[in-house]
Amino acid sequence: EYVDSLLTGSGSDLDNSTFKFMDPGTGRTIGIRADMTPQCARIDAHILGRKGVSRLCYAGSCLHARPMHPLASREPVVAGVELFGASGIEADAEIMTLAVRTLKKLGIDVVHIDIGHMAILHALMGERISDESVHGVVRALRMKDPVALAEAAVGFDPEVQQALQLLLRTFGDVSVLDILERELPQKSEIQAALREVRELANICGADEVSVDFCDVHGYQYLTGITFSVNIPNYAQAVLRGGRYDGVGLAFGRSRPACGFTVYLRALAGLQVAASHHPQAVVARGPLARDLEAQVEKLRDEGHIVVRLLPGERDEDVLEQFVITKELVRTSLGFELKAL
């Protein structure tokens, strides 16, 4: 799409990740989407135009000019959800619990969720949040580099410098919120954000919860809760989400919004669902009209039926399915035989 609609209101992170080229027909710059959220925001603003809450989902491929990390694919296949029109913690809870349930369905037995809140950084930075000087602060927070953070925060108020260093070194389980509530500036926005994190950590349904306010990706458009899920032996998050109120403002309709994206290629590469093969019925025998009709009848009833081809073995089927029944011919027709 033309970049003026593809990137509007999304911040420099997405701009830097977007492949761009010149349209020879118009001379305008075209980009290939690196994220699907801006497109969803435009759909909510212009195509749907609902006054109430909109719940949307999507799946598709994106293209990154720069990979998210050295081992990442530059063509991630993603799926996700967006909830527009609700600003309360209840909407955040709906999205986070859905994220946890999604990963459980995909076969991840122990879900570890990492929670942050962008309102804290926004409250500390104030109007500086859109300045170039903040890039160094954000980079240092991401790297958890106290020396680089001190250099980047030169000129900031001493209270802000101390608060940033506190965020950098204070992360872990939910108990660290006690320290942050006590030692961070007593601004109402900061204390409210810490309370939200505590409540969401309690109700999101994850097996393990940690708190880290240095995960500040997308700080230019994220406005509230942020969360990510990591799994063992994988370097990057397989799911990211958060709140980004006002993402549709550039399309003429500012709406509160939250959602998440799950990176399917990462999960497929780890074969996390391999131990959860679906159950199936196996049907064998030469071509016959009555046999094919019975196979179709079982499929219409909701059964997965694998019609064995010549030379195909049961062992081949077991790589994808758990065979629980076999369709066998009897003197009275067909019946399902348990295996």
Residue ranges and their predicted role:
Residues D4-F21:
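Glycine-rich loop at the start of a catalytic domain that most often binds anionic cofactors/ligands
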Residues T29-M36:
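Hydrophobic alpha-helical transmembrane segments in multi-pass integral membrane proteins
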Residues E75-A79, I115-A123:
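Short, conserved phosphate-binding/catalytic loop or strand-edge motifs used
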Residues M118-A153:
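Short terminal or interdomain "cap/linker" segment that borders an active site or interface and mediates
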Residues F21-G25, I231-N233:
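Short acidic, glycine-rich loop/turn motifs
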